[in-house]
Each structure stands twice: as C-alpha cells, then as structure tokens.
Amino acid sequence: MTDGTIRKVGVAGAAGTMGSGIAIVCARAGFETVCYDVTADALDAAKARTQGFFDKSVARNKMTKEARGAAVQRLSSTTQLDGLADCDLVIEAVFESLDVKQALLRHLNDVCKDATIFASNTSTLSITEIAGGCGREDRVVGMHFCLPAQLMKLIEMSPGVSTSDATFDTAWAWTKAVGQLPVQTQDKPGFILNALLVPFNNDAIRAVEAGVASAADVDKAIKVGLGYKMGPLELVDLVGLDTQILLCEAFYPVTLDPRAAAPPLLKRMVAAGHLGRKSGRGFYTYDGSTMFGG
C-alpha cells in the first residue's frame, strides 16, 4: 500500500469465532486475506467452518457458486507472523488482554512493512494503550466488529490519541469497501455497544439467577417485546461467558457501576466450564461447532 489503498488484509487470531468471521467479510468483499493463528489444526478447523458458511450462503441463494469459489481462493493461512509482512491492513482479534495485544503489535511492527495499518478488534480496551510502545502508534486504530461479524454490518471505529487522520480515514473507507457500516466513537471502555450491553446482559443473567424467569423466557421476552433478533443470554452464549467476565472486569473498575460487576451465576458457570457455544453449553446446550448463519 503506497497510495493509501488497502488490497491485502491479514487477520490475527483468525481461528476464533470473531477472527474467522472477519476473514469471511474480507474475502467475500474481494480482498486477499491471510489468516494467522498459532496452530495449523485450529486454522484447519476454522477453514472448514468458513467453507461451511459459504456453502450455506450458496444454498440460501445469498452467494453464487462462482463467488463462493473466488472467496475461498482469496483465503490463505499461516502460523508464522511474518506471513502477514506484506499486508496493507492487519486486524487483530486475539484474546482480550492488553498484554497479549500489545505484544502482538510489537511483533507485527517488526515484520510488517512500514505502511501497514494495525486495527484492533478490542471491545473494551483502550486503543491508545494497545498502541503504546508498538513503534507505529500513528498507524493503529480501533475497528470493533460485532458478532457474528459475517452477518452484522456495524463496525465501531475508534482513533487512539496518536492515530493519524490519514490512518483513520483509510481504515474508515475500507470498512465501507467491505460493505460494513462504521460509526465513530471515542476511545473509552466499551465504546458504544458494550457500554450499553454489558450491564444489560448482566441484568438478564441476574434475572435468571433470581428465579424471575428461565433463560429461554427472558430471551423470548426481549425478542418479542422489544423486537431484538437475539436475546441477551443467547448473545452471551455466542460471545462466550468467559468473555462476558472479561468485559465486566474491564468495565467495573473504571465505572464502579454495580450493574457492570460480574453476577455470581456467571462466575459459577465459567468455573464449571460452561462457556457458551464454544464449549457446547452455556445458558443453552449446543450439539455441534458450526459457523453461525449463512
């Protein structure tokens, strides 16, 4: 990328639910996409889920067979960070830990070309802090996709203190090029969505914990009564109960809002290994590991 145009995209953490969804968005929109994760087995499993998603899209007449084939051809995988060296944009969707994300960006700075933009898919952490010490703070931007990324159009775009206007404008234009709908938000915990959703989801968990209603009835009330496509407990299962705890741990110390504190039921379920879709059991049970939607 010498003219501000993004042509090749890397996704770090591409074997995860969010990362694989982001890779679908990129490849489907016509961009060469390099998927990085730490193990080949995880990448192979993600590839199978991705191809299954494309197959469903064809079956539902949302994609032609030719478009499916082209999208699959645009996807490649690597377990080496230097496989992302010539990408114009690298989107990280790794574990929601400041230390992990900072270390990744430092390593990417060592291997990627000078023009590469780094985008963080963090949902809670400060973009300014993530970028700190990476060596190209002016070329780091927040780019928060919503789960499932391949179906949800919204992206929350957040500049850090050092993010250049050119970086933000280029990243903003790219989100539109892949068919997403960006909104700009300040670099604050939770940005827009999670600042509202984390307490709301916790309230739903507490309602189940207090015996107000079953998880299914809480979700049904929200979907039918408020017109939501997904109930809060279905959403927590999709995001991961462990991730919901991480969100709480990021929010509560900053806001001191009691609604942002992790409910005891949530902690007990995570301790029992009930993490939602990823483990096969959360507020609901699941009988397979398939890509959401199609």
Residue ranges and their predicted role:
Residues 2-7, 29, 166, 176-187, ...:
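NAD(P)-dependent Rossmann-like dehydrogenase/reductase catalytic/cofactor-binding core
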Residues 35-69, 159-167, 182, 189-197:
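Rossmann-like dinucleotide-binding cores of NAD(P)H-dependent redox enzymes
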Residues 42, 56-117, 125:
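Rossmann-like NAD(P)-binding element
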Residues 1-56:
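NAD(P)+-binding Rossmann beta1-loop-alpha1 motif at the extreme N-terminus of oxidoreductases
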Residues 117-187, 191-195:
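Rossmann-fold dinucleotide-binding core
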